[in-house]
């Protein structure tokens, strides 16, 4: 999957996208003046069939739209994010090619299909995981990443709303 931003992203949004690339099997491109059509062309040149466009509100990432190769939005998340400082995230690395999905929220299971992440098999070691947990009244769900040593790493994504 190719990750990009809305035009003229803030530093925080760029940092979030780069931290996503470190935990997902994906690439990031600076959008600049590219149209979505240009981003889709670049995506297919790089061998991806989906893109994730990170939009922002008041300088912070606030929405992730997943689009297919035709530019149709297939899933949308309204989010707030926690971006770890570099010291915290360096303690654990995710092997993105070995990433598995563990979800407590059945409605968000399709994120695994969208991002080509296989499901976690019970009894397997708790490493290289994307975990979706139920949230509270403010956030419906929380996405956390666990590295190859089982320690939490990468961005924490608080999901306020989703649409498919």
Tell where the protein language model's regions lie, with residue ranges.
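Phospho-regulatory, Ser/Thr- and acidic-rich intrinsically disordered linkers and terminal tails
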Residues: 1-164
């Amino acid at each position: 999957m190719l990750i990009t931003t809305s035009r003229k992203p803030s530093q925080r949004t760029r940092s979030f996208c780069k931290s996503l690339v470190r935990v997902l099997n994906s690439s990031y491109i600076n959008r600049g003046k590219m149209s979505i059509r240009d981003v889709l062309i670049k995506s297919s040149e790089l061998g991806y069939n989906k893109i994730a466009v990170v939009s922002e509100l008041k300088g912070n990432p606030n929405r992730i739209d997943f689009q297919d190769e035709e530019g149709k939005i297939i899933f949308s998340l309204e989010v707030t994010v926690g971006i770890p400082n570099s010291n915290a995230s360096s303690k654990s690395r995710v092997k993105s090619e070995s990433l598995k999905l563990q979800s407590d929220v059945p409605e968000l299971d399709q994120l695994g299909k969208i991002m080509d992440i296989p499901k976690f098999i019970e009894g397997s070691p708790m490493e290289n995981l994307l975990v979706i947990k139920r949230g509270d009244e403010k956030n419906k769900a929380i996405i956390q990443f666990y590295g190859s040593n089982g320690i939490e790493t990468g961005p924490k994504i608080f999901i306020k709303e989703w649409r498919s």
